[in-house]
A protein has these predicted regions:
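A short, N-terminal "cap"/entry segment at the start of jelly-roll beta-barrel domains
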Residues: 1-56, 91
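Short acidic-glycine-tyrosine-enriched beta hairpin
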Residues: 93-109
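Glycine- and acidic-residue-biased ligand/ion/polar-headgroup-sensing regions
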Residues: 76-88, 93
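Structural motif
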Residues: 58, 87-89, 96, 112, ...
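Short beta-strand His + acidic residue motifs that chelate non-heme Fe in jelly-roll/DSBH
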Residues: 70-72, 90-91, 107, 112-118
């Protein structure tokens, strides 16, 4: 498998971070420190960095300031949300779940949901994505 790297951006001009390979190690402490030091964390109510991306799956580290809200939306694939630090309220039409550090949830695709940070929070979002050129359920 060929290694794939991120492209440099205005926010992250260094680029060249491995995004996909046969084996990718992810230093969550280092990425958490990085997103807390970036200008967008100072200027906004959130910041995020994609730490792994391949056909079929994406992993994103997300930081939210206290009271930051991700308005109601849906995901095109199944997701998991794992709180590393802090506390969020995760709301669907049926229920609201309080997730604290060390807790996680899984949610099927297409379910409308929102996220509210009750305190400064860092969480890991893992989502399944459609395989390029494949129909769902095909082998």
């Amino acid at each position: 498998m060929d290694e794939k790297f991120n492209d440099a951006t205005k926010q992250r001009p260094q680029g060249e971070r491995i995004m996909d390979a046969t084996l990718v190690t992810i230093d969550l402490r280092s990425f958490t420190k990085q997103i807390r030091e970036e200008k967008s964390w100072q200027d906004s109510d959130r910041n995020a960095i994609t730490v792994f991306k391949t056909d079929g799956m994406r992993i994103v580290l997300i930081a939210l300031h206290k009271n930051a809200e991700m308005a109601k939306h849906t995901a095109d694939g199944m997701i998991s949300v794992q709180v590393l630090e802090g506390q969020i309220l995760f709301t669907t039409q049926e229920q609201t779940i309080e997730l604290n550090s060390g807790q996680m949830l899984a949610l099927h695709k297409g379910v409308p949901h929102s996220v509210l940070a009750k305190e400064e929070t860092i969480f890991l979002l893992t989502l399944t994505t459609t395989l390029a050129g494949k129909n769902p359920g095909s082998k």
